[in-house]
A protein has these predicted regions:
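C-terminal binding/interaction regions
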Residues: 1-6, 10, 85-198
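Structural motif
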Residues: 51-55, 74-76, 93-97
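Short helix-loop-beta junction
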Residues: 9-18, 69-72
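A short beta-strand-loop structural module common to alpha/beta enzyme folds
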Residues: 16-31
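Short glycine/serine/threonine-rich phosphate/pyrophosphate-binding segments
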Residues: 2, 38, 60-66
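Short, structured active-site "lid" loops
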Residues: 34-53
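Short, acidic/turn-prone active-site loops that include or flank metal/cofactor-
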Residues: 24-25, 78-84, 100-102
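Short Gly/Thr/Asp-enriched flexible loops that form oxyanion-binding sites at enzyme active sites
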Residues: 62-75, 79-83
Length: 198
């Protein structure tokens, strides 16, 4: 993760952008899943605390779905520079999801063929590796709840999901600093303060 943040800071500095690392910074940091990342991104973007969010998870797919579950978040999936360019130029979204564990390499034509073969073969939702199945299925169920709740007014959506999810998402010191220093939507700021008991 340090290498990712280093490269993001370098690229952003060239363009005159400021970077806030509000996610995890290591295994001993404030614990966030891709579900929490979606909540954080939605709060930051809808409150206009930031203009763009870079997120991710092991494969990048969970973060992509979690961010896109929320109104006001338009997240693309990026595994190579062409993806980032086309997303920025064609889709003009406000978030990217990156795979932080899964690699991508030579033989793109073979890779895409295997992607399609694997996507349509066998029963879906079985988890991988097997020992992570339960947590993956739990997170998939939670994400479905989040999407259902988020399909309402933004704050009504936040209020309709498990409050513990939101409290965990906003509990990190770096998130709070970036959010409270930059948020421009008073209603969303008041909601987050209420969640934090302020």
């Amino acid at each position: 993760m340090a290498l990712t943040l280093e490269q993001l800071n370098t690229a952003a500095a060239v363009q005159g952008h400021e970077v806030f690392n509000v996610g995890m910074d290591g295994d001993n940091d404030h614990r966030l899943t891709y579900i929490h990342l979606g909540i954080c991104a939605a709060l930051l973007l809808n409150a206009r605390a930031v203009d763009f969010v870079v997120a991710g998870c092991g494969t990048g797919q969970g973060a992509l779905m979690s961010l896109n579950a929320w109104p006001g978040v338009y997240c693309g999936y990026c595994i190579e520079p062409t993806d980032a360019f086309l997303f920025a130029q064609v889709n003009n979204g406000n978030a990217l999801s990156l795979p932080f564990a899964k690699g991508y390499g030579w033989g793109a034509e073979i890779n895409i063929r295997y992607i399609f073969e694997k996507a349509f073969a066998g029963e879906r939702g079985q988890g991988y590796p097997a020992e992570r199945r339960e947590s993956q299925m739990t997170n998939a169920g939670i994400l479905a709840q989040v999407k259902q709740g988020a399909s309402k007014d933004f704050i009504a959506g936040l209020k309709s999901i498990d409050p513990a999810l939101v409290k965990q998402a906003v509990g990190g010191a770096r998130f709070q600093q970036a959010f409270f220093d930059n948020a421009q939507d008073a209603e969303i700021v008041a909601y987050v303060k209420g969640v934090l008991g302020q």
